[in-house]
């Protein structure tokens, strides 16, 4: 399941609640073509990796979160463990997304 983040507080709470689990954050926008293309794959990964927390942040709805996380383009995927960012990449690259999850799990 992918959790929609709607505020900076909700983002921090989700990171805190994850504990030792890997957190994968998809920063996207409704008007972004590549974001729309990879979204179903991102959701399918959330079913496949039940021990990983998947979050979605709409950069237009949560500009403060996107700014704090220094998101420059969409889609950007960031990876967190114990509240700390451990990885990041931009672009709708399915293979890289799954490989990066496997690297940190």
UniProtKB/Swiss-Prot annotation:
Disulfide bridge map: 32-35
Catalytic site: 32 (nucleophile), 35 (nucleophile)
S-nitrosocysteine modifications at: 62, 69, 73
Entries under Pfam families matching the protein: Thioredoxin
Residue span, Thioredoxin domain: 2-105
Residues annotated with N6-succinyllysine modification: 8, 94
Family: Belongs to the thioredoxin family.
Stated name of the protein: Thioredoxin
Protein encoded by which gene: TXN
